[in-house]
Design a protein with these regions (language model features):
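Membrane-embedded alpha-helical bundles that constitute the cytochrome b-like, heme-associated redox core
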Residues: 1-173
Length: 173
């Protein structure tokens, strides 16, 4: 049954990926979100500024908008990870068919990449995501945004000051 459960979950995950891609590329809201979550030079500058701040080498901390580098890195890591694990999974699922067109070394590498991508996803979920969403002092015992779709105005002001000021200027807050 393990194989059936694994493949059923894989089909569900790939369907979510396809739906998400269509939503982000074809809907007005999705296109707006894609622009917001797109990695820019500023995200890398913010990352290094935050590292300098955390090491006591700078007194300034980045002023994040709707998404900071953490959210963007996590989003793109998850999206590319799901794409990679889907492609390698399809190749492995159709192993006999794949062997007709691909050299054995490609299948061997596909098996390695598929396994390590799954392990990497598990480790990132266990440590990074668990800390940011549940254990970080600003959200402990959990960030309720996943339940309500909303964040507290004070939390927004502290964690994403540029977004807070934008929304305040628009009269939303």
């Amino acid at each position: 049954y393990r194989g059936i459960i694994h493949r059923s979950a894989a089909v569900f995950l790939m369907a979510q990926l396809v739906y998400h891609a269509f939503y982000m590329l074809c809907s007005r809201e999705g296109k707006r979100e894609l622009r917001e979550v797109w990695l820019t030079r500023r995200d890398f500058d913010d990352f290094f500024l935050a590292m300098r701040f955390n090491l006591g080498m700078d007194s300034k901390y980045p002023r994040f908008g709707r998404y900071g580098y953490k959210e963007k890195f996590q989003y793109w890591g998850a999206t590319t990870g799901v794409f990679l694990i889907s492609v390698t999974g399809i190749i492995l699922w159709a192993e006999t068919f794949s062997m007709r067109y691909l050299p054995k070394v490609v299948l061997d590498l596909t098996l390695i990449v598929h396994g390590y991508q799954g392990l990497l996803a598990f480790v990132i979920l266990l440590f990074w995501h668990l800390y940011i969403v549940h254990l970080h002092p600003s959200v402990f015992p959990m960030n309720r945004a996943w339940l309500t779709g909303r964040v507290d105005a004070e939390w927004l002001r502290q964690e994403h000051p540029a977004e807070y000021e934008k929304l305040k200027g628009e009269g939303v807050i």
